[in-house]
From Swiss-Prot:
Component of the EKC/KEOPS complex that is required for the formation of a threonylcarbamoyl group on adenosine at position 37 (t(6)A37) in tRNAs that read codons beginning with adenine. The complex is probably involved in the transfer of the threonylcarbamoyl moiety of threonylcarbamoyl-AMP (TC-AMP) to the N6 group of A37. CGI121 acts as an allosteric effector that regulates the t(6)A activity of the complex. The EKC/KEOPS complex also promotes both telomere uncapping and telomere elongation. The complex is required for efficient recruitment of transcriptional coactivators. This is EKC/KEOPS complex subunit CGI121. It is found in: Nucleus; Chromosome, Telomere. The lineage of its organism: Eukaryota, Fungi, Dikarya, Ascomycota, Saccharomycotina. Component of the EKC/KEOPS complex composed of at least BUD32, CGI121, GON7, KAE1 and PCC1; the whole complex dimerizes. One of its GO terms (biological process) is telomere maintenance. The keyword Oxidoreductase does not apply. GO terms for molecular function: tRNA binding. PANTHER family: CGI-121 FAMILY MEMBER, EKC_KEOPS COMPLEX SUBUNIT TPRKB. It comes from the Eukaryota. One of its GO terms (cellular component) is chromosome, telomeric region. Its main location: nucleus. Keywords: Activator, Chromosome, Nucleus, Telomere, Transcription, Transcription regulation, tRNA processing.
Length: 181
């Protein structure tokens, strides 16, 4: 698990955990209404890098700062910010976990300035997600992302041929930051 602070928003911390071998995605989805205020569960097939994830987190915090939030909480706003469109239900359908998801990203915003107890948070996350937590990093994310699916969702043309995952990540970060401008 990674706990981060975005320098421009020192009062908010963000926790990110990556899970594989998830066995209860359907159960998590059925409890989403009660969990949505606490966590966001994101399909890592559509996240090719930490840079992409942090770009959506930053966009979320900007939306909050300028009172442009379109969802009920920070976690759901971040899922929307990952999306190339402004359609909330479409964002959840595409970027949220599926009943058969075997990997997921667990995201939580912490709005108080207290220290985040990583062990307590890990205990809560592992009580919800029945799977193996692995380090949230680009190497592990690269094992799960689906370039064809990303191209379809973000409507990337066949002419766009990034040389590596960094080129793809840059394009997605640009799309996230420019949406709505």
């Amino acid at each position: 698990m990674v706990v981060s602070i975005i320098p421009q928003f020192p009062d908010i911390k963000v926790s990110l955990a990556l899970f594989e071998q998830v066995k209860n995605a359907k159960e998590i989805r059925s409890k989403m209404s009660e969990l949505s205020t606490s966590f966001a569960f994101i399909d890592p097939r559509l996240v090719c890098s930490g840079e992409q994830m942090y770009s959506a987190i930053y966009k979320t915090l900007i939306e909050v700062k300028y009172n442009k939030m379109r969802t009920r909480n920070l976690n759901s706003e971040c899922v929307l910010c990952l999306s190339p469109t402004s359609n909330i239900s479409d964002a959840f359908l595409k970027f949220g976990i599926k009943d058969d998801s075997s990997q997921l990203i667990c995201l939580k915003f912490h709005t108080n300035t207290d220290d985040v107890d990583k062990e307590q948070l890990r205990t809560i996350m592992t009580s919800i997600v029945k799977g193996q937590e692995i380090e949230f990093n680009d190497d592990n994310l690269s094992r799960f992302y689906d370039e064809a699916l990303i191209r379809k969702i973000y409507k990337l043309s066949d002419d766009f041929k990034p040389q590596d995952v960094n080129g793809l990540s840059r394009a997605l970060v640009d799309a996230i930051q420019l949406r709505g401008v």
